[in-house]
Amino acid sequence: MDALSPKKQPIALYPGTFDPVTLGHLDIIRRGARIFDHLIIAVAENPGKSPLFSSEERASMIRHEISRLENPTKSRIEVIIYNSLLMDCVESQGASVILRGLRAVADFEYEYQMAGMNQQINNKIETVFLMADSVLQPVASRLVKEIAFYNGNITPFVPPYVVQKLQEAVTRKKSFQD
């Protein structure tokens, strides 16, 4: 390749449970889409977790939020659902980068270990970490769900559409518990 010819940016895959998608996730998505030509948001169907929302509901919420982004950003983002080993998903999508967001040191330890395991599986796939915006560092889907369950204010943590969907889901869950 000629030194002056433009280098093609790799395809990146941003995996997660996104139960629900938070402003922190959306920040990583926006920033990742600025860095990579194509960003695939991969919504995990994780048998080890009991999500509040189905994988299709989670993907739908992400698609809704992406539709609100400006072009060309939103045209470079795709949302998929996967239920396989992450590295199999990465390879099947033609991605060469796994994008991950980091909030704190505890995230780093876990993500570093995962990146190491993924490197052992396929050393051609790189993991790129983006630090969470300092305002969004404490935001975690798990905590947002807990706050919503106790009727707390979740508007600083998730977009309005997700607030509505989360309130509906919590109401359904509470009605089943009664």
From Swiss-Prot:
It comes from the Bacteria. Its cofactor is Mg(2+). It holds the Pfam family CTP_transf_like. Substrate binds at T17, K49, L86, R100. The record marks H25 as: Transition state stabilizer. It is an enzyme of class 2 (transferase). GO terms for molecular function: ATP binding; pantetheine-phosphate adenylyltransferase activity. It catalyses: (R)-4'-phosphopantetheine + ATP + H(+) = 3'-dephospho-CoA + diphosphate. InterPro entries: Cyt_trans-like (IPR004821), PPAT (IPR001980), Rossmann-like_a/b/a_fold (IPR014729). Its EC number is 2.7.7.3. Pathway: Cofactor biosynthesis; coenzyme A biosynthesis; CoA from (R)-pantothenate: step 4/5. Reversibly transfers an adenylyl group from ATP to 4'-phosphopantetheine, yielding dephospho-CoA (dPCoA) and pyrophosphate. This is Phosphopantetheine adenylyltransferase. It comes from Zymomonas mobilis subsp. mobilis (strain ATCC 31821 / ZM4 / CP4). The gene is coaD.
